[in-house]
Amino acid sequence: MSMRGSMRRSHLRQVSAASLDSVSSRSVDTAQHDALQLSDHPSSSDGKTYKFSSTGLDRRQCSLWVHDETFSKEEILFNQAAFADTGVRDGDLIEILSARTVVDGPSSGQSQSHSFNLAVKPDMRTRSMRDVHGHGHSHVETASSSRSHAMSKFKTPLQTRCLFIAKPLPNEIRTKHPKLELSVTSSVANIFGFKNRSTVYISIVEQTQCAASHVDISFRDQFLVRSDMWRLVMSELAGKIVYKGQKIVFMGSIKATVKNIFIRGKKVLSGFFSPQTIPVFRSESAKYVLFIQMSREMWDFDSEGTGDILFSRVINGFLPELFKRWANADARHLVTIVLFTRVEYDASITGLPSTLNSENLKNTSEPNHAPTRDFYRVVVNDMASGHWTTILDELKKDFRTFLRDVSILKVPEDPVASTSASTTPKATIGGRPSTALRGNILEAIHLASSHLAFDHIDRDMVHTGTSIIVITPGSGVFEVSYESLASTTEALTNRGIAIDLVCLSPMPLHSVPLFKYREPNRGGRSSFSYGGDIQGGGYSPEMRHPFASLTNRTHFSPKSTFSSTSPASGPRGPWTRANDWSYGIPHWLDISYWNPETYRESRRILKKDPNAPIPFTVTKKSKLFKSRVRMYEIQMGGVMESEQSNISIPYLLEDQITSRSLNVPPKTSFRRNSHFNHQLSDSLRPGSFLGNMTNPKETILSRSRSASATAAWMDNYDDNVFRSFSKRNHRRKQTKPKRPSEPEVQVSTTHDRLSARSITHLREHETKPNEWPRKEAAPKIPATKAVSPRKPALKAPSKTKVPRISRTISFALRGLGVAPPRAQASTEVNVEHATGLPSSNTKRSAGSLRESKSIESLSAASDSTSTATVVEASPMPSTPPRQRKSPTITPSRPISIRVPLKTPIEDSDQPTRSVAESFGTNGADLPITEKASLEHQTRKSIPRFELTTSPGLRESSAKNLQSRLLAPWVRSINPCNTPREVSRDTSWFGRWQHAYPRPPHVAVVKWKSLKSPAVLPLTTEEFPTASELASDYLQTPYRVFPNDDAEGIEAPKTTGLLMREMISLRLSHGFQIVVGNNVVEASGRYALRSPNVFDTQTLEMDGATVFLSKGHSIHRLVCTGGNEIEVTRFVHRSLSDLVSEKKNGLDIVYSLAMRTIMSREYDIKHINLRSSAEEYNWNYADNYIAGHRDYLFNPAQQLHFWRVRFVLIPVRLHVHARRHMQPINEDNEEEIHLLGINQLTLIWQRHKYVPPEEKRIETSSKSRDQNPLNILYQTRNPSEVVAAELNLLADPGLESSPAQLLPESELLERSSISLSSLAQIVQSDKGVRMMDRRWHWRLHYNCFIGSEFTTWLCQNFRDIETREEAVEFGNKLLELNLFQHVEQRHKFRDGNYFYQISSEYRVARPESRNSWFPQIRPDKSIPSTPATADNWKDSPLSAHSRSASVDQNAPQTPTTPSRSKSKASVMLSKTLKYDVDPRKRSNRPEVIDLHYDRLHNPDNCFHIELSWMNTTPKLIEDTVQSWAATAEKFGLKLVQVPIAEASAIDQTQPFRQPYRVKLKVPPPKGPSSTIFNAASFSQQDAPDPHYFQKLILKKFDFVLDFEARSAFPPDVEVGYSWGRPDYRYSQYIHQSGTLLVQITDEGDFLVLANRLVSTRTVPFTGTRDRDHRARAGYDPMGTIERDRLSPRLSPLVRPIHDIAGPASPMAHSSLDSASLYRAPEHVLHGFEEFCNDPVRLGQLYSESFVYPVSAKAAPTTASCVDSSIPSLELPAPVIGHHISPPPGTPVRPETRTRAASTSANGSLPLIDPRSRQREESSVARGSPRSASIML
């Protein structure tokens, strides 16, 4: 976080980028004096004083060796025997110092210990004593060449010393090397600059002296939850020595590196990790969302620098620098870039949509705001950071058209009509971007963080952390609404992310980043109400005293409130109370300022330019004045070229504000938060000036009336300005107050000059000097003739000639009004007037001014609410009306006069009464009597209060709900006078306070955060007081105890383990462990001491108490003595209100216009910005961890399990892959795919989680060798199988493995069984299942499956222990001709292979056994069917084959079950507990829920879903990688895909939406289905409405992923183990895994890129040459996987060669892809090109009727280049041998491969894959049977 203005005493904070931490801000003499004082007793970081160890080992000289890992794996070997005289013991902390460091160190007159252990004061902003000490004694590194480059930053012994803990030397090494004293590994020697056999000095040091305060730990290419970080620290770091560059390996899988170590704010090379050390984890593989605010200033020119527009700073400066730093750090981030802006429209545009104004979260401006709309343009989404050139190219292209696209308004704007070809909306340029000040920055941030609510779904397993960078052309000040600030703050706080804000404008003169907001006016405060309809511009005369009841909620100085009395605030008076500006600095926002010149110098330093500035030094500041504000109109008006160029220029916009108050009605004059009033850092340009005016026409008219009077008054003022005070005072007493506002300049200071307030007060009564005396007795004035309450109406323009100097000023500055620059008094004159005031009142006024840092340096009319709390605390007595009209009040402290609830009647008769009647100036122009009266009144009614923020004010302001919601996440401050002591408070940084080892600078770019964002720290000190905890929080206690009776559950068995798991769960959900004194004081009876959160033994003790916090929620966990854990949840009352509002549906709906990557135009979206108010049921979660799980129906959704989904996509099996599969070379491609799935199921079964108690009971290895997954393989889609063979899926026998049917006494033995008896047993009821089975077009009678027979042999043979033995015995039986393969192609195999009993052993049956059991039970629900032949009766499989011969005109028969009225239910997937840690590397069970398909079609995807609650993700990632490597050997690609369907992606990821592709030519009605279906007994299936769409998808290598819910029969309840299918459309996925496609009901395609695919890559085992890649076709993964494990993460992903093979449909388009990111676009390009080609579509439609094919999308086989291969037609006997084709079905030609059917012109494939495989088998084997029986 940035030091929002607190780093320097002055608020004029100009800090050079070279002011680094090592630069001293103190004198050397003072530092040396402090060093002498601290040398004897150095102090620790907590201020305590420690004495040095009295041990004898103090700077002992020894010889250091350097060894490698072959010598010893220990990093440091220390021989204690060589130092026996020193009393060194095991566990002592020893430091090693190079002899060179000691020699070059301090003089010998001082103790060496002093140089090693010098301490510093706790103030880390002052220079370290160690640095100063070394500086004063020439303690510099002279031999830098011998050190590494990193050593150049470490100058003192404390920073360069090497620490280690003494431990015994192994006996073997001690025996072999008795002379060894000290030895370090080569890696340690390189870090510290040690040389082999060199001399070093060792000393024993205290742990407190070398304990690290912070340790930066970086990691990449892995997803780590914060609970894993906590466990890593406890296991690998706590109580150990850490050093820079140290490699950390946790559980053999999680890898991290120590980047930086800090001791008392200084970087060191090594340190001790104490219980108070704070680990800071930083991710080098994060997801970055870069928001670029395209506000109006982006197109402004940089007049001070190169003259480019500000956007050039982004595209040519900041972003290239950022990408270069990423590349240098080898960071592998994913980048999303979004351009956003808020467009303001002119309300006068005819036909403006009435809903346009509601397209915002909340109106952030005044009541009469202009209609606005927020626009978002997604440039890139999740692109690898290494492709930065591509990112910049895309950004430049979008910038060219961005302004045009957002400025055009279509009237009327009808989304339906705009997309229609018949209606062309009228396009007009109706808007312009708003300024950065009034942009939609909070809405953009909230939108980006909204997807984190679904962070547990579709978890990316190789990236950790989300960082949001906002690049703005502004200076860090934003006007926002209170509601948006509160909701965004609450969302970011609960989700644990921080924002980096990069400003392109110079840093302003106040604290930043700053949010201006107006707190809402809640009910119940009638005196504060608007008094009228604000939105309608209502005005209530009763509320004309706006300052009477102010409430200080923002802890500003009273000075800031006085801005409300500016001339522009006159008509706004009634609403000033509710609309006073509040200023807040959020702790979740880090601000940086990009200065191109600074980083040009840094580049020169890196390039070793001799003229570059010296590093680590401060360049002497130039004394030349450097302007902070450029006034474009003054520069262009020729003022500076005139003879008066040495005079003061007019104040900014003073006349415009004053004049606009004259005649503008209250509704239109309420413009206090305009951009030109506030943002001083940006120069005013013509566009921005005119665009912010409410009504320029009114301003011009008002100026013409006041021109002459203004000039005359200024001339008179010039005559008086140099008169002595006494003369002027005497003159004023004589002539009465002719210039009531003239003395305003007397108390004006430099701060007032910043705000243009002085000149406006000087001119407020310039035309009516005697206005006030008449005003008191003035009669009622009609409201229609009301003039400004702040400035009375001016006379008509005088005919006297205006002085010449008045006409030399450009009218552009003030809206064509005169502005004589001579009117300004110099600063010296102002000071003179201020000191010349009478002492009676000057003391108070000047004193307040000296203390005040005027808030009006922000703006001329910026409002505040500073006097509110004081007024409420000390009510002022009511004064008579005449006293209330007193015109004189000190300008530095405006009086707040309380208005009685019952306003006097006479007050309501004065609607035009001037504010000056209540607030004037105390000057010499008033009578002495009035001044004395006012002074007395001021002293009596105004309490004295300080200008700084105090805890008392903070606490009092937090009494209202609005402040409590923001505090402490947004600090209310006075931005122009932020106290140093307030900003030094560690709580200033909120939840991120422990991420900063030292306070950051504002003026420099936070590269550390931008390069590697920090993860939310594990610990925090943010905690409420005991009283707040008791009064403001609701408590919910409950108890949790381990479930001792949990069977088969990986539940913790002890209270200590349960405690750790509960803490881990909360850490992974964004909680932080609370440490520090606050929690100790607030914990009451548990207040023993802050526990060591990194010590497991401490946490497991009885009575151990741990507090965890997250936003407004606090959890207290207490280990009780009764084997229980007491949990108390503290929820803030305001948060409970938010939860109740959320339940009532009060979430914010944000309407915006967004254009995603592939969209052609902006679409209106309505996004529900869900409140992150906590709804998580922690009671259920804790009990689930403890093992109580019976009460949860769907824990994965109820408890927000982490969930990821994978699919196994069948791809072409390459020839080279077959070489490594010699045993299965006889299998075809489809069989190999199923064999791969079978191999995975064997792995799953092998690593199935078995509780330890079950392992002890388990005695038989047979049960372990079983494979009970029982996946049913079918060649039809699941919906077809459900409709046709429901009884098969509902059969309970399929749910589990066949039971052991033979009793133990009747078990068989291989040596004593005969073939005939075995054949009888196998075919009996106790034998293996035999039934009729169909595969593709063929039906096989009375056969069994090899895998089931293998299981049967293991169960029923006493002497068969393993499945391998069963397969061996089965092959012997096959050789003996007991059974044979149905096609006689395979030996006996353990898989999905079909076998039949030989005819000589076959038992005759009256009917075919065609189900799992001998007969179907009469109570089973089956579809109603007509009577058929005996051979086909009751057989769903045979009936399915028979359906094609049924007459089309046959009467339709309902297919609903005839015996049951309730729906039948069927589960299409199963689940098991899988152990991802079989090697037991973790100290806890690592178990996940593995869901897999129960029914699978080998042509489709095989689905896998993983869910877990508290398991280590890195172990899951390693497991999935091993699965992917196994599947890749069998032609299966494991790809991660989103859980939700593609059409719903925008519900979880706001910056993505599917791309719609339409067919240029609507397809004709598809042919009737020719697939045999059991539901077609008496009817012909209706034509598939999406037949041709599926055909096109199959042509482009798409395979079926999930079917739509509507595809399943409505009378069947279909479910999965992970939930019910909810897909609206059927979804297909490309074989590369990069593209998802859905077919809508209208027949359109919804296309979405799968951005998760490239995180799931596996290095190939074999080498692939170019020919192989050509045959592989489109395989973008293959060419880069061998180069890097995760190409998506690589900053330099190599180009993809031959991305489209010759057989691929995209082969005809030239492809020059540079990254995997482009792969989906190339697939989409060819796909969309085909859909838009009428000729190719027509050819496809016509050919499909000649040769109808199955519309089922299926994979292709090996590619074939030649399209001239003649299509081979299967002979009729081959087909007729199995089944006759249905009547009327044309003979379909077959080809050798699918790819051969794709001709060069993209004609349709002419082959059904099932027939293709039969033909392949016939050619290859020469068998008369051509059908391929799978596995």
From Swiss-Prot:
Comp. bias regions, Basic and acidic residues: 130-140, 750-778, 1809-1818
GO biological process: intracellular signal transduction; negative regulation of TORC1 signaling; positive regulation of autophagy
Composition bias type Polar residues, residue spans: 40-52, 911-921, 1438-1459
Topology with respect to the bilayer: Peripheral membrane protein
Domain annotation DEP: ranges: 1324-1399
One GO term describing the cellular component: vacuolar membrane
Family annotation (PANTHER family): DEP DOMAIN CONTAINING PROTEIN 5 (PTHR13179), GATOR COMPLEX PROTEIN DEPDC5 (PTHR13179:SF8)
Protein name: Vacuolar membrane-associated protein iml1
Organism (species): Emericella nidulans (strain FGSC A4 / ATCC 38163 / CBS 112.46 / NRRL 194 / M139) (Aspergillus nidulans)
Source organism phylogeny: Eukaryota, Fungi, Dikarya, Ascomycota, Pezizomycotina
